[in-house]
């Protein structure tokens, strides 16, 4: 199984990139969002890979982050969602936007993806409602670590973000407020303090 490709870009197609790894070229099917973030021919390229093996074919799907790859697999756990539709969803929504849509049961946001009709959108937001928070929380933690550094205490941060979203704020609003609170309170702040400071940020 191939988990990651590191090489140079040989060619970028409509829905794939050809990655040259020491003279061997691999075709990795990607979302439009991933393809837009890649460079040009002969530039370095790193992709997280999901390998599909079927009786008559082997396909590689490439992602910029491991989190995007996890969402790709989670989406396909829903009936009626295959690799093509999962890539279409990830082309339309970022992992954070997708988490928000599921948390808010926003079928309209999900149905913007090509190939996602009302029934599939309903199944996606309904069936993933109780399974997506872990992915959303991981996305928030990654974003906060990038913003604040590796010293972020994951549990208080996740608890604070969860509390603010339960009060009706979007995950993006909550994450931004907690990030600002962390800068004021410090890395060792508990969740109660982060919630209090986060609410002050949101009230501005």
Swiss-Prot record:
Region described as Domain II: spans on this chain: 65-143
Location of region: Flexible linker: 144-151
UniProt-annotated stretches for the region Domain I: 1-64
One of the GO BP terms on file: DNA repair
Primary localization: cytoplasm
Molecular functions (GO terms): ATP binding; four-way junction DNA binding; four-way junction helicase activity
Pfam families: HHH_5, RuvA_C, RuvA_N
Keywords from the named record: Cytoplasm, DNA damage, DNA recombination, DNA repair, DNA-binding
Entry similarity comment: Belongs to the RuvA family.
Subunit structure: Homotetramer. Forms an RuvA(8)-RuvB(12)-Holliday junction (HJ) complex. HJ DNA is sandwiched between 2 RuvA tetramers; dsDNA enters through RuvA and exits via RuvB. An RuvB hexamer assembles on each DNA strand where it exits the tetramer. Each RuvB hexamer is contacted by two RuvA subunits (via domain III) on 2 adjacent RuvB subunits; this complex drives branch migration. In the full resolvosome a probable DNA-RuvA(4)-RuvB(12)-RuvC(2) complex forms which resolves the HJ.
Function of the protein: The RuvA-RuvB-RuvC complex processes Holliday junction (HJ) DNA during genetic recombination and DNA repair, while the RuvA-RuvB complex plays an important role in the rescue of blocked DNA replication forks via replication fork reversal (RFR). RuvA specifically binds to HJ cruciform DNA, conferring on it an open structure. The RuvB hexamer acts as an ATP-dependent pump, pulling dsDNA into and through the RuvAB complex. HJ branch migration allows RuvC to scan DNA until it finds its consensus sequence, where it cleaves and resolves the cruciform DNA.
Protein name: Holliday junction branch migration complex subunit RuvA
Organism: Rhizobium leguminosarum bv. trifolii (strain WSM2304)
């Amino acid at each position: 199984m191939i988990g990651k490709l590191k090489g140079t870009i040989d060619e970028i197609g409509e829905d794939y990139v050809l990655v040259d790894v020491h003279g061997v070229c691999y075709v990795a099917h990607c979302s439009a969002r991933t393809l837009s973030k890649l460079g040009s021919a002969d530039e370095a390229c790193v992709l997280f890979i999901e390998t599909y093996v079927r009786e008559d074919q082997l396909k590689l799907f490439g992602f910029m982050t491991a989190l995007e790859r996890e969402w790709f697999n989670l989406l396909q756990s829903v009936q009626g969602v295959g690799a093509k539709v999962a890539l279409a969803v990830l082309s339309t929504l970022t992992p954070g936007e997708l988490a928000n849509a599921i948390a808010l049961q926003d079928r309209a946001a999900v149905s913007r993806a090509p190939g996602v009709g009302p029934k599939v959108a309903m199944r996606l937001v309904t069936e993933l409602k109780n399974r997506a928070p872990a992915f959303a929380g991981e996305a928030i933690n990654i974003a906060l670590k990038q913003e604040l550094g590796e010293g972020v205490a994951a549990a208080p941060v996740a608890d604070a973000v969860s509390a603010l979203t339960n009060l009706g704020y979007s995950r993006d609003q909550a994450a931004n407020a907690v990030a600002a609170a962390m800068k004021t309170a410090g890395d060792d702040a508990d969740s109660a303090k982060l919630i209090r400071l986060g609410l002050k940020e949101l009230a501005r």
